[in-house]
Structure formats: C-alpha cells, structure tokens
From Swiss-Prot:
Residues 59-118 form the Chromo domain. This is M-phase phosphoprotein 8. It comes from the Eukaryota. The chromo domain mediates interaction with methylated 'Lys-9' of histone H3 (H3K9me), with the highest affinity for the trimethylated form (H3K9me3). GO terms for molecular function: chromatin binding; histone H3K9me2/3 reader activity. It comes from Mus musculus. Homodimer. Interacts (via chromo domain) with histone H3K9me3. Has the highest affinity for H3K9me3, and lesser affinity for H3K9me2 and H3K9me1. Component of the HUSH complex; at least composed of TASOR, PPHLN1 and MPHOSPH8. Interacts with DNMT3, EHMT1 and SETDB1. Interacts with MORC2; the interaction associateS MORC2 with the HUSH complex which recruits MORC2 to heterochromatic loci. Interacts with ZNF638; leading to recruitment of the HUSH complex to unintegrated retroviral DNA. Interacts with TASOR.
Length: 858
C-alpha cells in the first residue's frame, strides 16, 4: 500500500516541508521540532501533516510564481496550496528539493515565455484519491520527508504494520453496528473489506496512470480530468449501493446474532475514512462489554435510529459527490481515542479545531443525559449544518462527517471515561489555543444549540457571555444570548465608569494639590517629580476639584527651588501654568504688578495670550486687572483685540474697566467692533460700555461696526443706543408728568460706571438754534440705571451719587435742592467741556446715563 501510494504521487499536488526557522512561511500552529519529535517517539503514532504534533509544518506547493537572484542564490516565489497571494513567500532552491517536479515545470515555462505569467499547471487530486487518502497520504508524506525526519517515518511504518488483517476485521465488524447498534456478520464485514481492497486497487491503477503521464499536454490533461470524474462517480455509486446492501443484510441477521455478539458500534463513517489504532481497539472492547445491558434496553429505539442513519448516509454521500478535488488526512493523538482532522488550509484547520472544542466541553456535560436524547438529534442536524457550511468554504463539507463520526463514538462511550477525556482535552487546549474566524464561531454556536438540552444551553450561554465581556466586537449569536449580553455590557460600562472615578479619587491623595497637574512618584519613595502636562483635563479631576480650581482654592504646590521674577514672567508669557503655580505658592514674594518697559503687566500678558487659568490664578493672588500701559492699553483691551471671549468675561467679572481709552481714544468696545465679534460686543455693552465715546479721530464704536461690514454688530449697537434714548425720554416724561416737552438732545447719551471712578468728563460741540422760543432752555439729566441684559431701568429719584457739575469751569445748579439728578445747563456755542464729580463707590453696580436736552415748559 505504501509503495502504491508513493507511486501515485501526483504532479498536481506536491508536499513541501518547511522548517520553522526559515523565512516567513504561512502561519502555522506548530511547536519546537525537538519537543514534538520526542513526543512522537514516546506516545505512539503521529500522522504526517499534523501541525500541532509534528516538529515541522507541512504545506503543499501549488505553483512557483517568480524567481529572483539575491546574494548569489536563486529565490523562488512560492504560492502555497490553500492560501492567498498575501501568503506567498520567497524560498531558496534548497527548500524545494522535495518539489523538483514543480521546480522543473516552472523552469520549463520560464524558458518558453518569460514575459507571460506562470499559468496554473498543478491540478488538485480528484475524489478517487480522497476516499482512502488517510492511508495513502501517510505513506506518501513519509517518503517525501525521509531525509528530514527518519524517526517519523519509522513510526508511520510501525503504524502500518500494526494495521494487520485481524485488526481490520475487528474494525469492520464494528462498522456493521453503524446503523443498528449490533455487530454484523463476519461474511458481511469480509465483503466490505474485499470491496475496500478492490476500490483501493482501482485507485492505485488510476494513480499509476497519472504517474506515467506526469507532464501531459493540454489535451491529455482534459481527458484525464474527464476520466477522473467518471471514475469518481462510478465508485461513489458502487459504494453507496454496496453499503445499503450490507445494511439490509445486517438488519436480517440482527436478531440471530443478538445473543452471540452484543457489541457497541462506532461512527457511521468508519467504512469511508476512519482507521483506529491498537489502543483504540482495546478501549472500545472494554466499552462494548460494559454496555451490553444498555444495548438490550434500547431495542425499541433501533428502528428509529436506522431511519436517521439512512437519511444521514444519503446526505453524506451527496456531499461527497459535490466535494470536488479535496485532500483528506488522518490525525492520531497520543490518547485512547482518535480525533480526525484534515490539514489542507490553515484557516479551515483552525475552524475545525474550534468546532471540535465545543464537543469536548459537552462530553463533561452529557453525564446525566440519556443516549436516546443524544442520538435523536445529531444526524439531521449534521446534514443541515454540513450544507450550510459548504457555502463559506469547500473544506467544511468534509470536516463535518468527521465531526459526526467522532461525536457518535463519544456518545456511546461509558460515562466513566468522560471525565478523563475532558481533563486531557482541557490540558491540550491550554497548550494550543486555536484562532477562529467569527463566521466559524457563528456556525459552531448554531450547530451546538441544536444538540444541547435546556440545561446545557444555559451553561454554554454563561461561557459565551464571559467571552463577550472580553471581546467587545462579538456578534449576537441568538435571541437567548441577547439579553445576557446587554445586561453584561451595562454592568461592564457601569463598572468601568465607577473604576475610573474610583481611580481618580484614589489618585487624588497622591497628587500634589492641583488636580490639573499629576505627580509621578517612584516606588522607592524618591522626591515627587512634577508632570508638566496639559492643564484643565477634566478626566483628571472631579467636579469639586474643578470648582476649587476655578475659584483658585486648590491646594498649593510645595517646592524648595526659588523661581526668579524674570522666569516667572517668562512662564506667564509661555502659558506655563505649573511653573507659575509653583512660584506663587512658594514663600517667595513676587510683585504681580511688575511692568516691563512698555508697562505690560503679568495680567496683560496672560490676557493677551488667552491664558485663562493663569489669569484666574493671578487675579486670585491679588494682581490688578486695570493696569495701563504707557499707551493706555489695558488687559481688557488686549483680550478684546485678540478676540478671546472667555478672557474678556473673566476680566469683566474681576472688575475690569470697560470705558478706558487708549492714547488713540479707542476702547475695548471699539476693538471688539473691529474684530466683528458680536458676543464680546454684547458682553461689553451689557456691562455698561459707553457706545458714544469718540476716538482721537472722532469715530465711535458704531463707525467701526459699520466699517467692518458686520451687520449683526452694527444692529446690536444701534438697537442698544435706541433703547437708551427711549428709556431716558420715557423716564423724563414720567418724572415731570408732561409738564416738560423734550425738543432735541444737546449731545448723545453717555454711560459711566460708578465703579470706574468718581469723576466723569466729556467734550461736546453745541450749536444753539437761531430763534430761541420763550420758556425753553437746556437741562442736564443724570439718570441712575441698571442693565438687565437688553433691558434698561432708569430713575431720577432716590439715592444720588452726584456731588457737583462743572461746565466750562463753572458750577451748575441743581433744579431741585433736595435732588441732584437734574441740573440747569448753559452750554456755549462751540466746544464745551463737562465735568461731573461723583461719590466714590468702587463696588457699585449702578450705571449713570448722562444726557442734556433742550426742553420747553408747558
């Protein structure tokens, strides 16, 4: 058999052995060569091509794509069978010694036409070679790897010697119980064995013919393909008929042999693809003796199981016909049971391992379940699952019968062996964890849920839920898992959030006062090192800490190094909050109002840079916000000019003056109008900014708003001025009860914040009318007003802060002796200078609206 298999090696599928240490081969799950060879020598037969047990991974070369010369050596680009172009590797010629035919074919093609791409000449083996490939592949690969691993070859030869005719007879007698749970007649098994030998001889003849024509022409290749297909169909048809005849004969002789041979059957696919080793036979015989009693109790169930088997067999054979050219391999493990595995493609191999892992867990759960419950479900489920599996890959359709075969063996085994096998499986799974694609996981879960009882489903759901906690990208497998997954995700999110804040709270004890800064403390207790990172990261602090930070009440830093004034100034200029914090919390005294050559203070530097944290810190430490440069610029003007809205808000809250003018007469409101920032404009005018102040060039804020073509800012200012005029006139009419008629204003209404100082002054031009009507004159009104957003409330009664009014160096007299809101006013034609002395009230919120009107008594 070994010689025939060797001669039948096809030029269409060559096996190449690649050591783990060379280059980049397609991914494998192999382990060290030395350890695996030692394991193979001591534990029994090891099938060639098993990527888990062999020291080397065995891959099939599909074709050679390209060749290049590098470092004086020829490298060949190899396409591996079952892999995509992404897994192509460059291999030296020495690695292709076992694939000389492929190499010669490539060289021949290269000589014929170098410009053309290498055509795919290597064809896969037909199903003729697949039926008993578990036998032939072992011999074929043993000869291929003769020089590399002699010990493995000896093991394989020993395995073949052990498979004696007596063993085959035992195995075939078990196959008879495939459908009816009883041992078949010796004649039936002999016929099956004889049929198998004839079938193998026919396959060997086909292989010999294929070997004689290893390099056929295109026409010969087509004829060979047609011949293979015809032989394949004929063999499958004959095999199906033969098995059905054996089933009928077994059914007739079942009752006669019942008392003499009550033995347990094995998997339904033994006659097709599975061969057991000697250890398997011993354990199975024990198993059969122990189950004699249970077999007698199950006679009533056999007719149902026979029908299930026939249906299952039809499905399997129909899948065999559609399978195409696929390679089936046998895998033996150093344990008392056999688990078949096909090595053809790495992804499909991993998927099969994962699908095998679930039945291993299930074995331990099946202890309390009757054989009737287990045997009624698998067969139809297998057929349905196998068909759906073929849609995602060709390999799956052949793996599923193996899986069915393996599970039927395990279900019929005594309960005493479940725990031992579960322990062995658990140990091996701990050593080798397969990588599985998500699509295979979905198929596996759907596959298993059909076979499990309600109690088992609950156990599997718990295990799957644990996996879903680890993998956030897992998909919902079925409706039963959805609720568990949602609840677990909610718990996990709540736990993560709680842990995050708990970690922050715990870390707060290690931080050096300010939650914005983190300190890195070494494990050996060395001096804490300041982490000069980004400030104001809210993930680092709780809400209470952030509020303390805003209020400047966070704990001080402790430092022993003195920071000089020039470095403090540079830190403010560069926005280094930590350095400023350390300096201001030290014992060193700093002049926070220090000025440079232009009069720029630290507050101005922070405002001009938009450093809100530094600005709050400096204000908290007592820095003045209304300092002026030599050109009259203030911190508020800097912030408005640089368009920093939050900085403007901080300064206004700290009491910054809004009507301060630069040397060119411009105010913060004018700067905001130039920038076109309506938010800053609204914020400033609601705080009492004077919209009618004129610059050095006699331009008002309204002029700058119009100049920047910002309609929103212009309308905002115009609306505010109209509101002030309307409120002033209404207040006058209400106060004088229509005894006084307003003719025209003498100058636009001015606004002065009492907190900005006790003195108010303004210049205006007055042009008296040519004809002054009798009973008319000019009065000065000083309203006390409050701004409530866009609303303005004014009064001419109550407490008054006006002490004196001076016009052109002449005191003006109040109209009412007990009230200083209304003064007689005598301007001259031309320029006039008005000065008003007020009560000093630096914290007053009241605004003064100052306006003069020409009035007529009625």
């Amino acid at each position: 058999m070994a010689a025939a298999a060797e001669e039948g090696m096809s030029a269409a599928a060559l096996v190449m052995s690649v050591p783990d240490s060379i280059g980049r081969s397609p991914e494998s799950e192999g382990v060290g060569a030395g350890d695996e060879e030692k394991d193979a020598a001591t534990k029994g037969t090891v099938a060639v091509g098993d990527s888990e047990e062999d020291g080397e991974d065995v891959f099939e070369v599909e074709r050679i794509l390209d060749m290049k010369c590098e470092g004086g050596k020829n490298l060949y680009k190899v396409r591996w069978k079952g892999y995509t172009s992404e897994d192509d590797t460059w291999e030296p010629e020495v690695h292709l010694e076992d694939c000389k035919e492929v190499l010669l074919e490539f060289r021949k093609k290269l000589a014929e036409n170098k410009a053309k791409a290498v055509r795919k000449d290597i064809q896969r083996l037909s199903l003729n070679n697949d039926i008993f490939e578990a036998d032939s592949d072992s011999d074929q690969q043993s000869d291929t790897k003769e020089d590399i691993s002699p010990r493995k070859k000896k093991k394989k030869i020993k395995c073949k010697e052990e498979t004696s005719p007596e063993d085959l007879r035992k195995k075939r007698t078990k196959m008879g119980k495939l459908k009816d749970k009883f041992k078949t007649e010796l004649e039936s098994t002999s016929e099956i064995i004889g049929f198998d030998v004839k079938t193998k001889k026919r396959i060997w003849e086909v292989k010999e013919e294929l070997k004689d024509s290893k390099k056929p022409k295109k026409d010969e290749i087509k004829e060979t393909k047609e011949l293979k297909k015809a032989n394949k169909r004929a063999e499958v048809r004959d095999l199906k008929i033969k098995i059905r005849e054996d089933v009928k004969e077994n059914r007739k002789t079942k009752k006669e042999r019942y008392i003499e041979s009550p033995l347990e059957s094995e998997s339904p696919n033994d006659s097709l693809i599975l061969e057991d080793d000697s250890e398997d036979f011993i354990s199975d015989n024990r198993e059969e003796n122990q189950n004699v009693r249970s077999v007698r109790d199950k006679t009533a169930q056999e007719t149902v199981q026979e029908g299930i088997f026939e249906k299952h067999l039809d499905d399997l054979i129909s899948i065999e016909e559609d399978a195409g050219t696929r390679v089936r391999r046998k895998k033996t493990k150093p344990r008392k049971f056999e688990e078949p595995k096909e090595i053809k493609k790495l992804e499909s191999t991993n998927a099969f391992l994962e699908r095998r892992a679930i039945p291993k867990k299930q074995r331990n759960q099946d202890k309390g379940i009757s054989n009737l419950e287990l045997n009624k479900l698998p067969s139809p489920v297998f057929a349905q699952t196998l068909k759906s599996s073929r849609l995602s890959g060709e390999e799956k359709s052949l793996k599923s019968p193996d899986l069915a075969e393996e599970e039927k063996e395990k279900k019929n085994e005594p309960k005493g062996k479940y725990q031992k096998r579960y322990d062995l499986d658990k140990e091996e799974k701990a050593r080798k964890e397969p990588k599985v694609l998500k699509s295979f996981k979905e198929i596996r879960n759907a596959f298993d849920l059909f076979k499990k009882t309600t109690e088992e489903k609950n156990d599997v759901l718990e295990n799957n839920s644990k996996r879903e906690e680890i993998s956030l990208d897992s998909k919902i497998m079925n409706d039963n898992k959805t609720k568990d997954k949602c609840s677990l995700k909610e718990k996990r999110n709540t736990r993560d959030e709680t842990d995050t804040w708990a970690y922050i709270a715990a870390e707060g004890d290690q931080e050096v006062s300010d939650s914005v800064c983190q300190t890195d403390e070494t494990s050996d207790g060395r001096q804490p090192v300041l982490s000069l990172g980004m400030d104001l990261q809210l993930e680092w602090m709780k809400l209470e800490d952030f509020q303390k930070h805003l209020d400047g009440e966070d704990e001080p830093f402790i430092t022993t190094n003195r920071i000089p004034n020039n470095l403090l100034r540079d830190a403010v200029k560069n926005g280094d909050y930590i350095a400023v914090k350390v300096a201001l919390n030290s014992n060193e005294e700093y002049n926070l109002d220090q000025e440079d050559s232009t009069g720029m203070t630290l507050v101005m530097l922070a405002a001009a840079g938009g450093q809100d944290d530094l600005l709050r810190l400096l204000i908290t430490k007592g820095a003045k916000v209304n300092g002026r440069q030599k050109n009259g610029t203030t911190a508020l003007i800097h912030a408005a000019e640089k368009n920093f809205l939050t900085t403007v808000a901080i300064l206004l809250e700290a009491g910054a003056f809004v009507n301060v003018q630069q040397s060119n007469g411009e105010t913060a409101l004018m700067k905001a109008c130039k920038r076109g920032n309506s938010d800053i404009v609204r914020l400033v005018i609601e705080c009492g900014a004077d919209c009618n102040i004129l610059s050095k060039h006699q331009n008002s804020a309204l002029y700058f708003a119009k100049q920047c073509n910002n309609v929103l800012v212009y309308e905002l200012l115009k609306s505010h001025l109209e509101t002030l005029s309307r409120v002033a006139e209404e207040t006058i009419r209400d106060y004088f009860e229509s005894r006084l008629a307003l003719l025209e204003p003498v100058f636009p209404i001015a606004c002065h914040r009492l907190c900005e100082g006790p003195d108010f002054s303004t210049d205006f031009n007055y042009m008296p009318p040519q004809n002054m009507p009798e009973g008319s004159g000019v009065l000065l009104f000083i309203f006390h007003a409050n701004f409530l957003g866009k609303d303005v409330i004014a009064r001419l009664c109550g407490p008054c802060s006006v002490q004196a009014v001076v016009l052109n160096d002449k005191f003006q007299l109040p109209v009412f002796l007990d009230s200083h809101f209304v003064y007689s006013f005598s301007p001259v034609a031309g320029p006039n200078k008005l000065f008003i002395r007020l009560t000093e009230a630096p914290f007053a919120k009241v605004k003064l609206l100052i306006g003069a009107y020409r009035v007529q008594l009625q």
